Each structure stands twice: as C-alpha cells, then as structure tokens.
C-alpha cells in the first residue's frame, strides 16, 4: 500500500513460490493506517524477500491482533521505518528460521529482544500458529486464543462471527483442541547438520486447554518409523 490511509483487516493472505513473497506491505507516505486481525502465511523460499509484514515508511500506524507467519524461512516482519509513532501490540510473529523482525539493519531472532529495543509488542506472541493448511489459515495454537485486544469497529471475524471481549489473534475466531501436544522446536541442532549419528532433543509444548500428563511421540529416520517415545509428567 502506498497512500495516505488504509484499513486492512480480517484477511487471509498466503504467498509462496521461489521469488518475492510479501504478505502486507506498507509503503512510503502513509499516515494513520490500521492493520488489524489479519492472518498471513508466507511459504515462499526467498529467505530475504519473503516477509509476512513489510513496513517501508509512514507514521502513526496501528498494527494489532495479526498473525505474521513465515513458514518459508524468511522474515516475520521487516521494518525500514522509525517505529516511535506506531501503536503495535498483540500480534504473533513466527519464522521457521527465527527471523522474527528486521529493524535498523539488525535481525532479531527473539520477540523479547525486538520489544526491548523498540518498546513495541509487549503483549505479542512468537509461536507457530499451526494453520489448518497452507491456505486455510485457521490457527490451532492455544496461545493465540483469547489473547488479542478488542478494537472499536472490528467486532466480527472474517466469517461474520462476533469476536469475544478478549478476541483471538488473526482473522478467524477459533476454539483450540482440548488435548493437544506438539513439538515446538528442535533444541540445539546446528546448520548444517554434522556427519554421523547425533542426539535429538525437542521441546514438547501443550497446545490445548487441558493439562497434559502423558504423550506418545512418533518419529521417523529417513522415512523409517522408529520406536515411539512415551513421555509422562505435567505440562
């Protein structure tokens, strides 16, 4: 967008391929534009020009309750503009390569580091939304459920359902699974992987609403199923 004002809300946005993949792009000369309740999924393989959110200029933007996910290895957000006048919070930023934000020529691989420098996104998240599919952008992560903030004038979701007092992040109001465990990330893997056998550690995350006391982890090596791992505890 390259104009004075725009309201962008309640959208599913997916972009893939091998070239430039942009979700929402705010260009120069904008003022007061609002980006609210959008679900973005970038699957393009360009790790530099793949950006779920791009801000190249403008002032006084409001950016809230969005999911900016880059599953192609690029940036969740890219800023070439001063953020001091922005109202930016209650968003989810996710990148498979930990490229949460690019700002002032620095890549921030954690949301906490980006927030500490900018003073923005204090209530935002950095989790994989686990979209239902590449193009069906209903999230399935409990940390995005009821963790947004109400915004005047945007009281219904993309399908016309009424948003709650504490709305969900993204374009769609959703109900997470009751019992749902998932692998949040692999721990300590180097890139590229060294030759030979290596221990594999993963971080298991409760993505449902109930406390979990057990889970069975299925896994494969080169397409060959291995002995399932049984976990017990409290999560």
Residue ranges and their predicted role:
Residues 4, 59, 165, 195-196, ...:
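Residue-level preference for beta-strand/loop junctions
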Residues 176-235:
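Extracellular/luminal regions of secreted and cell-surface proteins that mediate adhesion/ECM remodeling
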Residues 101, 156, 219-220:
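Short aromatic-centered micro-motifs
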Residues 46, 71-73, 92-100, 146-153, ...:
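Acidic glycine-/aspartate-rich tracts in secreted/extracellular proteins
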Residues 92, 108-173:
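C-terminal accessory segments
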Residues 1-17, 25, 31-44, 59-70, ...:
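Right-handed parallel beta-helix
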Residues 1-2, 13, 17-24, 43-52, ...:
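Short glycine/acidic-rich loop motifs that flank beta-strands on beta-rich extracellular proteins
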């Amino acid at each position: 967008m390259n104009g004075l004002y725009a309201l962008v809300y309640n959208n599913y946005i997916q972009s893939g391929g091998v070239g430039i993949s942009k979700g929402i792009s705010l260009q120069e000369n904008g003022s007061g534009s609002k980006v609210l309740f959008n679900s973005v999924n970038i699957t393009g393989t360009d790790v530099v020009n793949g950006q779920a959110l791009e801000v190249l200029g403008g002032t006084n933007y409001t950016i809230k309750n969005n999911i900016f996910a880059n599953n192609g290895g690029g940036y969740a957000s890219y800023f070439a503009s001063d953020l001091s006048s922005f109202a930016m919070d209650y968003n989810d930023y996710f990148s498979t390569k930990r490229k949460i934000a690019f700002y002032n020529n620095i890549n921030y691989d954690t949301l906490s580091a980006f927030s500490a420098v900018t003073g923005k996104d204090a209530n935002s998240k950095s989790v994989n939304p686990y979209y239902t599919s590449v193009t069906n952008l209903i999230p399935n992560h409990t940390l995005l459920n009821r963790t947004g903030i109400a915004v005047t004038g945007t009281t219904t979701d993309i399908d016309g359902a009424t948003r709650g007092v504490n709305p969900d992040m993204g374009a769609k109001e959703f109900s997470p699974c009751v019992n749902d465990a998932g692998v949040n990330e692999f721990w300590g893997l180097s890139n590229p992987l060294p030759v030979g056998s290596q221990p594999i550690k993963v971080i298991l995350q409760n993505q449902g609403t109930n406390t979990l006391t057990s889970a069975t982890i299925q896994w494969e090596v080169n397409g060959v199923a291995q002995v399932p791992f049984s976990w017990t505890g409290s999560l």
